[in-house]
């Protein structure tokens, strides 16, 4: 949380000198890969011996996957299932990255703006790639508005609106997670025992909310690119 584990700190320091990046960026890279490896191991454990009647890790993962899939279908409709791999991957990665910061000695990757920006750019590119693939060049009508003589003005406004989406996704997630880390650091500095516990419990709630908001906005943006322009 505040003091990284020695082994991971060693990797972070080596990476910092190798790539000439800041300590925060090096920590973000190391802990991002830590989360990725953790999720890969969890997936292998869950799928190692699949059973018709799931139990243990398989049962837990099926509940998570089914919950995300149902949410996608309820928000986007049946065609939203095709976007399940993208949205579920982002949601689970962000959630685990958020929760990792609550473990003493770990740094949440989402408390670094580079990590949140990467996730936001993926959503931004996916939104427009899906829109162009679905509508072809008619996708540009989304930027023109319903009145032809206002098209130049509407195009400018729509472009600004679309460019602001990855910025808002980036700063919302980064601001909340980084702010929570700073608050925890202050509480641990003042009273390192029981006082920070309420903030850590609130951190669990914040982690779930931020992952949910990011996933929900990703679904809304992609769904918007699929709708017919008027």
Curated annotation (Swiss-Prot):
Protein's membrane topology: Multi-pass membrane protein
Keyword set includes Transport: yes
UniProt-recorded Gene Ontology molecular function terms: proton-transporting ATP synthase activity, rotational mechanism
GO CC field: plasma membrane; proton-transporting ATP synthase complex
Keywords for the protein's UniProt record, in alphabetical order: ATP synthesis, Cell inner membrane, Cell membrane, CF(0), Hydrogen ion transport, Ion transport, Membrane, Transmembrane, Transmembrane helix, Transport
Keyword Transport: yes
Protein localization: Cell inner membrane
Pfam families with a match to the protein in the record: ATP-synt_A
GO BP term (any one): proton motive force-driven plasma membrane ATP synthesis
TM helices/strands, residue ranges: 26-46, 83-103, 112-132, 143-163, 182-202, 203-223
Subunit-structure text: F-type ATPases have 2 components, CF(1) - the catalytic core - and CF(0) - the membrane proton channel. CF(1) has five subunits: alpha(3), beta(3), gamma(1), delta(1), epsilon(1). CF(0) has three main subunits: a(1), b(2) and c(9-12). The alpha and beta chains form an alternating ring which encloses part of the gamma chain. CF(1) is attached to CF(0) by a central stalk formed by the gamma and epsilon chains, while a peripheral stalk is formed by the delta and b chains.
Family: Belongs to the ATPase A chain family.
Protein name: ATP synthase subunit a
Species the sequence originates in: Trichlorobacter lovleyi (strain ATCC BAA-1151 / DSM 17278 / SZ)
């Amino acid at each position: 949380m505040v003091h990284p584990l020695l082994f991971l700190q060693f990797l972070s320091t080596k990476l910092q000198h190798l790539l000439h990046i800041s300590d925060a960026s090096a920590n973000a890279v190391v802990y991002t890969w830590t989360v990725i490896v953790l999720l890969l191991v969890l997936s292998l454990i869950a799928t190692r011996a699949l059973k018709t009647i799931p139990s243990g890790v398989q049962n837990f993962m099926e509940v998570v996957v089914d919950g995300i899939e149902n949410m996608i279908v309820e928000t986007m409709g049946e065609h939203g299932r095709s976007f399940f791999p993208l949205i579920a991957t982002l949601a689970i990665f962000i959630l685990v990255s958020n929760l990792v910061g609550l473990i003493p000695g770990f740094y949440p990757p989402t408390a670094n703006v580079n990590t949140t920006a990467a996730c936001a750019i993926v959503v931004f590119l996916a939104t427009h790639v899906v829109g162009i693939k679905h509508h072809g060049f008619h996708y540009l009508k989304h930027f023109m508005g319903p009145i032809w003589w206002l098209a130049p003005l509407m195009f400018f406004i729509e472009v600004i609106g679309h460019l602001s989406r990855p910025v808002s996704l980036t700063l919302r997630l980064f601001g909340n997670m980084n702010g929570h880390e700073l608050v925890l650091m202050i509480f641990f500095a003042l009273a390192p025992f029981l006082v920070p516990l309420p903030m850590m419990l609130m951190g669990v709630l914040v982690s779930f909310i931020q992952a949910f908001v990011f996933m929900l906005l990703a679904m809304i943006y992609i769904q918007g690119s699929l709708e017919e322009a008027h």
